[in-house]
């Protein structure tokens, strides 16, 4: 099959969240199954210095009344064909943000559709998150191109319909409130990035006001778990580590722990219980829970904590405050650094993911691969990947809690700290975690089956009256409504 991946991110060049890892790692796993898989992303300014890009494009056209060009290069790791949509709107190095974000990604979706129609024509166009959400709408009546839409994070839903109608061509048959909604309605298959998240988003608690719509399309909704690249993330061969190690010879972790403690300004104590967190510093990731329990944990246990990431300024400031209160025991590094992230996975004893919601999560898979035991909330993909430790049966791979409450998180942390003090049992726990196999090969087979189901098949148009039942609607420009109210008050 010919498959084109369209996304706003692609690791390692363009990565903010887990979507970048998926778009980088899933295509080569599919290519190993014999498929012709290619990728298309916006031609962000920084890519021209990172990749070998020919000066002449392979395709020129117009989208939304503006000229664009498509350049062909190769992905630096997989060597798969990588297409870049060149346009001045993508010249800045930023990926997200800015007043033009809605226009930029709607334009990217439009340019991708033009490219798929008139240049390299895929059988399956695999779209990722709202940035590509209009593509399934435009492809809905093309019998030669089927669409798959992957939900990485339902919280981010893109521009409302009234704004889409101002920016671009919206077909007469289009239903739905915003870009995320129309993508789910018109894609031939929709999938979430874990089985549990696929179920959760059909409930009011996690559905982000789209649970009614998701139940309406549940017949074409799937849950496919993400994986990790086992070659890239391999503690036996990882060149970023001071000492390599494996499940059968775990001694190298001691050297990595000492190196991490030294580099982060922590007291170099081999027996301290070292906890790590890597990721976006936002409420979704449960950083506020960590802030509420950290002082008590540090007061009553011999723990140390290291945090790596960037995010909301209030959370960053609160983490800095903890670092100043507990020098040598709490460290924070406000950036993303691949080398440091690998050292945290390889040097910490446990890894923290107390998420409010978690579509899949990659970090817990990497932590287990490197022998750092996850302490997670039972939500989303964390349910599918981390099983609770049972010391009496010597089963499980981590420590889990249910409610998003400080006391529940703290209790899980104390249980993990107590387990850490029983070193032989802890080593067996580490070995169980390290021998889990969440490779992309398994996920690729599931995606391949979904592609086979959908290839050459077009879903019927959604019923307008049924869709209207699920509208939460901002169906007109709010500024126009204000203007009408003002006129009536005169």
Swiss-Prot record:
Which Gene Ontology BP terms does the record give?
Answer: glycogen biosynthetic process
Transferase among the record's keywords? yes
Identify the residues that bind ADP-alpha-D-glucose: 15
Q: Which EC number(s) does the record attach to this protein?
A: 2.4.1.21
Identify the domain of life.
Bacteria
Instruction: State the Gene Ontology terms under molecular function.
Output: alpha-1,4-glucan glucosyltransferase (ADP-glucose donor) activity; alpha-1,4-glucan glucosyltransferase (UDP-glucose donor) activity
SUPFAM superfamilies, A to Z: UDP-Glycosyltransferase/glycogen phosphorylase
Which reactions appear under catalytic activity for this entry? [(1->4)-alpha-D-glucosyl](n) + ADP-alpha-D-glucose = [(1->4)-alpha-D-glucosyl](n+1) + ADP + H(+)
Q: Which UniProt keywords apply?
A: Glycogen biosynthesis, Glycosyltransferase, Transferase
* Record-linked NCBIfam families: glgA (TIGR02095), PRK00654.1-3 (NF001900)
**Family in the record:** Belongs to the glycosyltransferase 1 family. Bacterial/plant glycogen synthase subfamily.
The name this protein goes by in its record = Glycogen synthase
Q: In which organism is this protein found?
A: Prochlorococcus marinus (strain MIT 9211)
């Amino acid at each position: 099959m010919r498959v084109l991946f369209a996304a706003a991110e692609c690791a390692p060049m363009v990565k903010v969240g887990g979507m970048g890892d998926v778009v980088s790692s899933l295509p080569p796993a599919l290519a190993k199954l014999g498929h012709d898989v290619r990728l298309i992303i916006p031609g962000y300014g920084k890519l021209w210095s990172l990749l070998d890009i020919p000066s002449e494009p392979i395709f020129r056209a117009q989208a939304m009344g503006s000229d664009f060009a498509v350049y062909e290069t190769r992905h630096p790791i997989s060597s798969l064909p990588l297409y870049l949509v060149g346009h001045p709107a993508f010249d800045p190095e930023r990926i997200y943000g800015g007043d033009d974000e809605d226009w930029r990604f709607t334009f990217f979706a439009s340019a991708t559709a033009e490219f798929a129609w008139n240049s390299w024509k895929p059988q399956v166009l695999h779209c990722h998150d709202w940035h590509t959400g209009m593509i399934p709408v435009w492809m809905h009546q093309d019998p030669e191109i089927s669409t798959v839409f992957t939900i990485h994070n339902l919280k981010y839903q893109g521009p409302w319909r009234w704004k889409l109608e101002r920016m671009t061509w919206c077909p007469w048959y289009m239903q739905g409130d915003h870009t995320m909604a129309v993508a789910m309605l018109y894609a031939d298959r929709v999938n979430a990035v874990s089985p549990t998240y696929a179920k959760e988003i059909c409930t009011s608690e996690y559905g982000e006001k789209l649970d009614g719509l998701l139940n309406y399309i549940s017949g074409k909704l799937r849950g496919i778990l993400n994986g990790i690249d086992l070659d890239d993330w391999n503690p036996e061969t990882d060149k970023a580590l001071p000492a390599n190690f494996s499940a059968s010879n775990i001694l190298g972790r001691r050297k990595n722990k000492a190196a991490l403690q030294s580099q982060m300004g922590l007291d170099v104590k081999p027996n301290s219980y070292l906890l790590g967190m890597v990721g976006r510093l936002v409420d979704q990731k449960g950083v506020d829970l960590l802030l509420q329990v950290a002082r008590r944990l540090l007061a009553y246990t011999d723990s140390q904590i290291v945090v790596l990431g960037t995010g909301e300024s209030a959370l960053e400031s609160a983490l800095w405050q903890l670092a100043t209160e507990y020098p040598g025991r709490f460290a924070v590094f406000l950036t993303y650094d691949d080398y440091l992230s690998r050292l945290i996975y390889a040097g910490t004893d446990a890894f923290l993911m107390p998420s409010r919601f978690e579509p899949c999560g990659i970090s817990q898979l990497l932590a287990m691969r490197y022998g750092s035991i996850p302490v997670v909330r039972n939500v989303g993909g964390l349910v599918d990947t981390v099983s609770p430790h049972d010391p009496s049966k010597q089963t499980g791979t981590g420590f889990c809690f249910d409610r998003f409450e400080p006391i529940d998180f703290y209790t899980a942390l104390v249980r993990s700290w107590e387990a850490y003090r029983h070193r032989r049992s802890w080593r067996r726990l580490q070995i169980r975690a390290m021998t889990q196999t969440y490779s992309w090969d398994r996920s690729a087979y599931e995606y391949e089956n979904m592609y086979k189901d959908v290839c050459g098949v077009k879903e019927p148009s959604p019923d307008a009256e049924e869709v209207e039942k699920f509208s939460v609607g901002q169906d007109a420009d709010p500024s126009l409504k204000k203007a009408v109210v003002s006129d009536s008050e005169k």
